């Protein structure tokens, strides 16, 4: 007697074209949420690293030294636009056990329609994960990724700010896991 395995829930919107122009918030987690991307996972805001955020308001910044895998992840993030015409990495954060990306896909460049279609978000993430794996010699990623299609300017600004302050709120993050003693 064969037992039927449970079917995985589809992570993407079934009728949405993930190659169309737009803004996308992507989160990619490490396997078993291993905290391997920062050199020190218990960081606090550093002295004299306040960032002026306007209206005479300063926000303390966390300066997170990246581990070797974290540095490779950052290099691969910065290379994404060179692999895909019309794809911009607007903002990113390398966290101890996950990565946030704010990607812009544009079908227009310099006021002209681009000849080649833009890759889908899934293809971009697959290439990124593959590049990190190739550079490290082994995979550090969990299967799949989380995505959110950003539909409004307000949503874009909120996610941009979330990514910007995420390192200093690491201990409050939903992906935070208490490190073993």
Q: Predicted segments — roles?
A:
Residues 1-181:
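Short catalytic/metal-binding and nucleic-acid-binding patches
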């Amino acid at each position: 007697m064969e037992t039927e395995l449970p079917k995985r829930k589809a992570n993407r919107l079934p009728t949405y074209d993930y190659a169309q122009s737009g803004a996308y918030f992507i989160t990619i987690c490490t396997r078993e949420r291993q905290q391997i991307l920062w050199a020190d996972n218990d960081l606090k805001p550093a002295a004299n690293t306040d960032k002026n955020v306007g209206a005479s308001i300063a926000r303390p910044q966390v300066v997170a030294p990246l581990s070797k895998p974290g540095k490779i992840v950052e290099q691969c993030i910065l290379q994404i636009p060179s692999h895909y015409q019309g794809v911009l990495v607007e903002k990113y954060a390398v966290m101890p056990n996950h990565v946030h990306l704010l990607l812009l896909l544009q079908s227009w460049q310099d006021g002209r329609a681009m000849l080649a279609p833009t890759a889908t978000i899934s293809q971009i993430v697959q290439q990124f994960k593959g590049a990190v794996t190739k550079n490290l010699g082994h995979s550090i990623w969990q299967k799949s990724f989380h995505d959110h299609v950003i539909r409004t300017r307000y949503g874009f600004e909120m996610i941009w700010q979330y990514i910007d302050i995420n390192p200093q709120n690491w201990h409050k993050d939903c992906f935070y896991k208490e490190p073993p003693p």
